[in-house]
Amino acid sequence: MAPLACDPTALDHAGATVVAAGESLGSVISTLTAALAGTSGMAGDDPVGAALGRRYDGAAAKLIQAMADTRNGLCSIGDGVRMSAHNYAVAEAMSDLAGRASALPAPQVTGPLTVGAPPSAVGHGSGAPAGWGWVAPSIGMIWPTGDSAKLRAAAAAWATAGANFMAAETAAGGGTMAAIGAQQIPEGAAINKALADASSATADVARQCQTIAAQLNSYAAKVDQVHAAILDLLSRICDPLTGIKEVWDLLTDEDEDEIKKIADDIRTVVDNFGREADTLGGQIEATVSAVAAATENMSHWAGKEWDHFLHGTPVGRALNQVGQAFKGVGEEGWGFLKGLYEVSPNRMLLDPVGYGKTMAGMVEGAGTLVGLGPDGVPGAFDAWKALGKDVTHWDEWGSNPAEALGKSTFDVATLALPGGPLSKLGKFGHSAADALKGLKKPPGVPKPPEVKPPAAPKAPDSGQPAPSGKPGPVAPSGKPAPGPADGPLPHSPTESKPPAGGTPPAAEPPKPTAAPHSGEPKPIATPPESVGKPVTPAPAEGAPAQPHEPVSARVPPTVPAADTPAPSAPAASMSAASGPPMPPTPSLPEPASLPSGPSGDLPAETPPTAGIPHSGEPSAPSSVPPHFPDTPTHGLGDGGAHGPPESDPKNANGHGPHDASLDSGSDHHLPLHPLDSDDLAALAHYTGPGYQELNFALREGALDVSQQARVDALQKALEKLPVYEGAVVRGTNLPADVLEQYRPGEVITEAAFTSTSTDHTVAQSSAFAGNTEFRIWSTTGRDVSSVSMYPDEKEILFPAGSKFYVVSKTVDPQTGRTIIEMIER
């Protein structure tokens, strides 16, 4: 568990700063609504203006609601930070036996801000000039009544609100996140993620305010243009402002054709204006969808409720006891419903066999309680005594009296009801008899199969010298040989993993070329620890070293491969229980730089969960060293969670960290969608030997056709795996120039795949620690632990091209490590 280090006062101050920033956003909203109050009817009531005005009304209402949700969400986040500080202060005060520490007062929850819709833009704006009456009958429409002055006033109000909205939140953002990042608390990453969400929502809202302002200014300009064009056309037949026609027109009355021509020109101008306004209305509607996303994100935080601890108070203790009692009632209530079904007529019709067995068990159990049980069963008194303990939950009163009280109360109340305790006499009777006779014993471990020891070596004939340098086959110890003190560290689950061929599974046993001598027993491997565990095979000649074994620790045997007896493979050792063994499949070849014995070109066996790699995939480069270098060259480092943790190579099930078996009983998440052979091959290749080659090519931007195909296959497989949302950690070594690139407030794009782990303890151990520790809040990372070659590492893998927002960058004064906190974008 990570250490706790919290300054409640500093944390409370940071929360108060966030609340103040939220309240300042409320002031911006109030100023905006006041400015918009005088813009009613600015779009006009003509067909074009009314259509655009209705679109504006919907967008403006959504945008103001998004502003209110952002304000309420930011205040709620601040309240949560202050409540967290209060809880830590209470815990610190309760742990101070001297009574010197004082708790912070519980903060007041900030009330939500409610806003109404702005005034409608649809209404009578500007009036038509007097000369409009000469052409109105020929046009068939009313004067465009939009008021450009009101439109520009509304645009200025929106632009000012957007700028002030962004400035108010930014003023408190960076310093607050830095203050919270300095606290070593479990919820630190979640708080910073919430603040990042608020910052993103604020930026979206401010951007949409500027968009609305630009659209209103554009419409105001179009209104002015159409008004000017119409007045210019009207001036050809009359004074547009007075409507008085020329004298010759009154005398000759030959202006009707001219008026119709002018009316047609005005209709063309108005039609063009309508099309432009319709396009502008579509842009305003697009604003609504962008605003809805920000509203949905921040309304989640606005609806949060924050409570403070009741521990150590009489009210808290009383509520805890009541809750435990109701928990017991609920558990027994569920059992009551199940018992009611078991003795119901419906079950008799649906499951007559099961119903008959239940009733027979009740009769037999009742006989035990009245002393009519089979021979060797305890008497009636002892049976009733055991039954009473079951009904009253006697053994649970010492550990959880409140829950035991709830269970006992429910059982006593439903004692004689169908489905109650008396309906379970068969079960209780058998339980009492078994308990009193000591029949309930833990299942025994099956006896391992008897294995004959290897026969003693045959004595040489007289006159022949005894062969020297021919040691017999040695059974493996089941544990990897320890590496040298100055050798490389074990593969870190958050840093680097072995290259191709560096951590192969057990090698396939060599097959003898000649039949063994008759009468000689065949040496075999050490017997398994228990039934169901695979026998650890002896490593093949020339096989590469195990993860914790240096290359120099391997001594090639001197016995020829033809005379070496084949050890039992893991699949063969389980053949009696699980069917015929799976045939071994060849894995990637061993690096050329490693020494090999006579049988060094024998193929290695692929682990059960590794899948079958693509045929024709290129092998790992022969120049790769047996251990990946500690210092990566780019980005987060080339490491992944691909190496055994610093612990006993064998876990409780007898499997080593590399013995990934589907029946290992591990608690990993299953894939969301079925994985085909291509998916398994891609995952096995990456979590095994192929990560280094792919990541190097991705960072250099030099993927060949084969590598691109493997990257695409891995990306496709990751999409089928479950998403992990939560904190992950990664340890690595970064050079100073790469470390300098991680600056708070910037977004880092990782071109390669990024491996992390959920096991914080293993990642921070001395064996795996580098000079840098990344603490990342994952939102779309994929849990590959169920299909990894090393499932114990609990790996969370981010796809290539993932983006991370750098929240903070600090140096741990105790360890000297750089701690970088990031949020996946």
Curated annotation (Swiss-Prot):
Gene3D superfamilies: Toxin ADP-ribosyltransferase, Chain A, domain 1. Residues 656-670 have a biased composition (Basic and acidic residues). Pfam families: ADPrib_exo_Tox (PF03496). NAD(+) binds at residues 687-699, 730-733, 750, 795. It is found in: Secreted. The active site is at 730, 755, 795. Its EC number is 2.4.2.31. Belongs to the Arg-specific ADP-ribosyltransferase family. A probable mono(ADP-ribosyl)transferase, it may ADP-ribosylate Arg in target protein(s). This is Putative NAD(+)--arginine ADP-ribosyltransferase Mav. It comes from Mycobacterium avium (strain 104).
